């Protein structure tokens, strides 16, 4: 049922102009076996099922392909392969919503509204529901971090010799930062500049490797985290005027598909991806 609702919302969110995605040809560079290759990883965030994560990366690839003809020659000369680095939903990830329901005795829907300032919550109550499960690096699963780091290392090393771009969403940004740090703390370290990050809706205070990020001013979840942890990266984009803001499915302005369905956030994210891929194209991983 949840997947059906998600699919319905995705279809509604894409404008009629987006329907051209279905007619977009594959990347010309991918037809050339000698063309350099970059793996673009999507790392999902909080309470994202595997099916939802696949929808998210599909949306990302379609938006990228739609704009590829207008991107730099360096990006077009590369074959950009999209891949999912999935974070299983469970355990501490689900604790975010469980805390909202059990500790505060409210539904997640009402929780969003309360955090928007429509009612009076104390900072302590918000902290109890948010601070630990969502932002505490100690609660991130170590085996998942190791698996992510290994996936990036395998792409960069011979015989793959690929560059890596990571696009994490929500808590996926914390996993990505941790995997990046692990990757470069264990020998042999990848060549400098072979990994770039473009974060979306990040609860983190930094982007590893001096990467880029986009967080919307209307992202209720990240705004709530910033209330407790002021050093959380500030908002630097928005969803503009869009029906998504009136949708019951827009997830408090935090949805990845929402970020890629509304402007200027969509344009900003794709611009960051283009600049990151352009920089990666100048690096030889092997």
Regions found by a protein language model. Name each.
Residues 20-24:
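Boundary at the C-terminal end of the N-terminal hydrophobic targeting segment
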Residues 1-6:
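Bacterial N-terminal signal peptides that target proteins for export
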């Amino acid at each position: 049922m949840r997947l059906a609702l998600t699919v319905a919302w995705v279809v509604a969110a894409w404008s009629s102009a987006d329907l051209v995605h279905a007619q977009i040809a594959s990347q010309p560079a991918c037809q050339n076996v000698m063309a350099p290759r970059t793996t673009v990883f999507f790392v999902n965030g909080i309470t994202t099922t595997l099916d939802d994560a696949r929808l998210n990366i599909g949306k990302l690839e379609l938006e990228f392909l739609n704009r590829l003809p207008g991107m730099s020659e360096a990006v077009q000369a590369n074959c950009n392969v999209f891949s999912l680095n999935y974070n299983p939903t469970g355990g501490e990830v689900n604790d975010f919503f469980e805390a909202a329901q059990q500790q505060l005795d409210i539904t997640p829907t009402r929780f969003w509204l309360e955090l928007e300032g429509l009612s009076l919550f104390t900072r302590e109550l918000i902290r109890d529901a948010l601070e630990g499960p969502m932002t505490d690096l100690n609660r991130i699963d170590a085996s998942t971090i190791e698996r992510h780091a290994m996936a990036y290392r395998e792409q960069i090393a011979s015989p793959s010799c690929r560059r890596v771009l990571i696009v994490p969403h929500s808590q996926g940004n914390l996993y990505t930062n941790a995997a990046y740090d692990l990757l470069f703390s264990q020998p042999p370290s990848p060549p400098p500049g072979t990994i770039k990050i473009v974060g979306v809706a990040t609860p983190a205070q930094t982007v590893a490797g001096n990467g880029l990020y986009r967080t919307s001013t209307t992202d209720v979840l990240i705004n709530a985290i910033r209330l407790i942890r002021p050093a959380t990266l500030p908002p630097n984009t928005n969803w503009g005027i869009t029906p998504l803001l009136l949708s019951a499915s827009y997830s408090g302005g935090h949805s990845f598909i929402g970020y890629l369905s509304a402007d200027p956030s969509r344009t900003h994210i794709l611009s960051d991806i283009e600049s990151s891929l352009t920089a990666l194209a100048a690096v030889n991983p092997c």
